[in-house]
């Protein structure tokens, strides 16, 4: 059996609507290594359904031909099935993305939601909701100091995966315990044991001196 290290990967999906405007179809996916900040995979996806390219996508320069000529959902799915078993996938909104692409949870080693993790710490408390309100990716990215490259824009899979990876890393930094100075490492119970040992050694030395037979000269 060959083992491989577990990798933490930020993932983002983008969508188009079908021509009946009744459901979302995945049209783009990007995966980015959280530790190395390296893009692992990104592609447009040819939706299974007849689809509509929204004005927002057209403004980003994405055309219907871009999606028609992209790999099919079946081709991408086969690749991800072989790629994901050693990946812990980190979504911004895991519930939404897994609703539209549930196979990701089955293929991956595990899944995490960055939006929930961030919002539980920084989201304003909503008394009607009974929990912290969810924070938008753009707002969380701005708050944590994420800086986009000139070619980046939100609601592109590569940009959103990059922002998600950055935020997760920042949360990890905050979660690490502060370094402990060496003079604090000695716990009270260890100190007591050492002190008792020192007293025992002194007592043994004293007893040895009292029982010593003096030399005749």
Question: Would you name each region that the model predicts?
Answer:
Residues 2-109, 137-146:
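Conserved non-catalytic scaffold segment of RNase H-like nuclease domains
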């Amino acid at each position: 059996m060959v083992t491989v290290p577990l990798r933490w990967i930020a993932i983002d999906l983008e969508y188009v609507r079908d021509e009946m405007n009744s459901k979302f179809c995945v049209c783009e996916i990007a995966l980015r290594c959280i530790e190395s900040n390296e893009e692992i995979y990104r592609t447009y996806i040819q939706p299974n359904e007849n689809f509509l390219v929204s004005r927002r996508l057209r403004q980003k320069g994405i055309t219907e031909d871009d999606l028609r000529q992209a790999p099919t959902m079946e081709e991408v799915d086969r690749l991800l099935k072989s790629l994901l078993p050693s990946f812990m996938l980190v979504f911004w909104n895991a519930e939404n993305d897994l609703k539209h692409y549930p196979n990701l949870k089955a293929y991956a080693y595990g899944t995490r939601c960055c939006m929930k993790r961030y919002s539980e710490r920084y989201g304003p408390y909503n008394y009607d909701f009974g929990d912290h309100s969810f924070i938008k990716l753009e707002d969380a990215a701005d708050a944590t100091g994420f800086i986009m490259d000139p070619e980046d824009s939100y609601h592109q899979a590569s940009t959103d995966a990059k922002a998600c990876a950055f935020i997760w890393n920042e949360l990890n930094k905050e979660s690490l315990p502060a370094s402990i100075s060496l003079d604090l490492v000695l716990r009270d119970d260890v100190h007591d044991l050492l002190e008792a040992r020192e007293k025992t050694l002194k007592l043994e030395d004293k007893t040895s001196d009292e029982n010593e037979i003096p030399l005749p000269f």
